[in-house]
Amino acid sequence: MKKNFLNLLFTTALMLSANYSFAQYPNIPADVKKASDSMLKEAYHQSDIAWEKAKPIIAKEAGEGKPYIPWAGRPNDLPQSKLLAFPGAEGGGAYSFGGHGGRVIVVKNLNDSGPGSLRDACEQGGARIVVFNVAGIIRLKTPLIIRAPYITIAGQTAPGDGVCVAGESVWLNTHDVIVRFMRFRRGETFVGRRDDAIGGNPVGNIMIDHVSASWGLDENMSMYRHMYNDSTGKTEEKLGTVNITIQNSIFSEALDYWNHAFGSTLGGENCAFVRNLWADNGARNPSIGWNGIFNFANNVVFNWNNRSTDGGDYTAQYNIINNFYKPGPVTELKDPISYRILKPESGRSKLPYVVFGRAYVAGNIIDGNEKVTKNNWDGGVQLEDKKGNLMSYEQASKYFAAMKAKDPFPMPKISIIPTLQAKDYVLANAGATLPKRDPVDTRVVKQVSTGKIEVHPDAKPSAFQFEHRRLPGDSYKQGIITEVSQVGGYPEYKGTPYKDSDDDGMPDAYELKNGLNPKDASDASKITKSGYSNIEVYLNSVVPVSIVKPN
């Protein structure tokens, strides 16, 4: 109740303020900024306390072969496992260690912090595998900052309907992270905390699989770079995230409350973004935030407004292969944006003329546009001039000879299937489908299939309308929402905890069936002939490989 009152108070203060910015970003009143800064200061303070507790075990495990390398900026800066992160893992993050060989930590409650909470599990040091014996919504009061490396978060282990993280952002400020079958649905509109549902400063060896991220106030997910501070007083270095995969995930319905309904900013070195769905985000579907080779294949993009896939810079290289773009109700079919596959950027060039990176663009389908589907370069690759104005096809085509690559650029190993087959696969399998797909993803996927938007019967425009919004107050009818209430809010997530007598993350029934001792917690970490520990074998057994990678 107190938080809702503060939100109302801050929004009212903003409405009464005469000093609006003429950019797309709101002007934050001083009292709002003070409150936000105070909250973040306390969040960092609590994170620092947890970090100090974690450092001794991080140092100990570094001496045992699991070093902490926050300065990594090239793919070979980080050692990689000889084992796949899990069967079906692909791309640059396929050999992330995650929590392999570490202890098991069971999340037992939905609290923001304290023993048994997700935050407590994530803030601990050392290799760790986080499992769930609780279902429901975990409402974060402050950002969840994950700093210690070597962690696996296994949402598929939750009972019943599974878990959903809400209220604040999750920051992956480390390396060797595996996140599977998790929902990050932020859902807040407080102007002082316009942030992603999940993002942060990811270093590398990141594997994101079957994640559902939505209702972010900046983007739903950002993964492309990290800022490294060597503590010597030098300026922070901006380094690319290395060895990263985002696969089989859904990024939908970013909140447009502050004119910022953005899907994702992605990139990095040795990256792969494959078999994902971006739906009902006005822009950044996704945006390309780094100048390495951007590998984007077998994805589905639906119902964008002013931006589909764009970004990079004049040194970037792009593999844009076999993706399915479906304009939706908010997409202006008469405008070039409706058939845009890629808009590479040249803005960072200091040359007096425009210059663009090189691109392999092939096999992509623009639903309803036969011309661009037949030849992706016949209108699908769009360029801007030095003034930021969109070139005509005749103007842009003069640059194509230098831009167009005959063959794909080198990429990490991924399975690339025919575009329509990929579209069906994504709609059937993407997102946190285990322990079961929730009503949010079910509704979004249905919208992609039918092209029709579903809203709550009592949906109405937000009481406050940011004056610089591009879209009208009832844009939710076209799929671009400003508040979660317009689509019915959070669903219920129910589930009964399973019996786990030794608290090792494996249900007693599973242990008995597989010859393990349900009263001996130590067997969870024992390595099997497969190379995986018993707990990892259990995690993998829950997930059919057919929903991870197409046959």
Q: What does each model-identified segment do?
A:
Residues 86-130:
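Acidic Gly/Asp/Thr-rich repetitive segments characteristic of extracellular carbohydrate-active
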Residues 24-85:
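Primarily auto-inhibitory N-terminal propeptides
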Residues 150, 155, 175-186, 204-218, ...:
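Right-handed parallel beta-helix
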Residues 25-36, 43, 54, 58, ...:
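C-terminal functional modules
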Residues 119-126, 138-152, 163-180, 186-203:
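Extracellular beta-strand-rich solenoid/capping regions of secreted or surface-exposed proteins
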Residues 295-307, 317-327, 331-366, 371-392:
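Predominantly extracellular beta-rich ligand-binding scaffolds that present long acidic/polar faces
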